[in-house]
Amino acid sequence: MKDFVVITFYKFFDFPDYKERQQPIFNFADEQKIIGTILLAHEGINATIAGTQTALDAMVNFLHQDPRLADLTYKVSTAPKQPFKRLKVKLKQEIVTLGQPNVDPNNTVGTYIDPKDWNDLIQNPDVTLVDTRNDYEVGIGTFKGAINPNTKSFREFPDYVAENLDPQKNAKVAMFCTGGIRCEKATSYLLNQGFQEVYHLKGGILKYLEEIPVAESLWEGECFVFDERVTVKHGLETGHYELCYACGHPIDAEDKTSAAYEIGVSCPYCIEALTPERRSRFEAKWQQRQQMKACQAS
């Protein structure tokens, strides 16, 4: 069986008619049997979708017909199994939620650094390297020497900056995220706060893993992605993690050897929150899931 093709893309632009575009975009994607998530907001578009190469080419061509999206670019990877359950085209306040209405990457954004130049930048001792992703993502993999802000959501990032970074002490700041979109806002926010030299990895971790050979890489671990693959590694090959059915935290083979792991019920990251009521609920849901799989297979 051929792998599923996955593309990711985003663009910040003035999109006042985003609500009117929701149904046409959904209809076209649905006709092409595309699955995944497309987010629309006044500030732009953000998507990760999967399908056949022909269908995805048609989708991109459809979006390119809008002059505002004529220069839309995308990243391509593959998945060994269907990476999404359905198609969703959702209306949002932001295409990536920072909660800072004055931040506009269309007006102010950091300096883009290509993957081939990233290693030189982050090995500079004068550069403060910050991972803008959430704590559970950082725990799976990050760049050597990167700071983990220990955030549970991107909304907490401004608080981290206020408490830990200083424009005078941190003269050069480099940031990175999965595909680049969070850094668009993160770098814009830092520049608004008075930081002078702010850089971000163009195309994000995914582009780096796609282009940089393992022998030259400063990346350690795997990269969490928001689909059924869970993680990817160099070359964008599907990684070794899966999600705990109970709490949704990424788990690996070592986690599954823990006494805290019970399939469908708990893992080392949620065992402390497990109550008798939650156990009963998760056990029932797991049994229902297995019954549905058995029915689909018969």
UniProtKB/Swiss-Prot annotation:
The keyword tRNA processing applies. The active site is at 177 (cysteine persulfide intermediate). InterPro entries: Rhodanese-like_dom, Rhodanese-like_dom_sf, TrhO, TRHO_N. One of its GO terms (biological process) is tRNA modification. It is an enzyme of class 1 (oxidoreductase). One of its GO terms (molecular function) is oxidoreductase activity, acting on paired donors, with incorporation or reduction of molecular oxygen. Gene3D superfamilies: 3.30.70.100, Rhodanese-like domain. Keywords: Oxidoreductase, tRNA processing. Residues 123-217 form the Rhodanese domain. Its EC number is 1.14.-.-. It catalyses: uridine(34) in tRNA + AH2 + O2 = 5-hydroxyuridine(34) in tRNA + A + H2O. Belongs to the TrhO family. HAMAP family: TrhO. Catalyzes oxygen-dependent 5-hydroxyuridine (ho5U) modification at position 34 in tRNAs. This is tRNA uridine(34) hydroxylase. It comes from Picosynechococcus sp. (strain ATCC 27264 / PCC 7002 / PR-6).
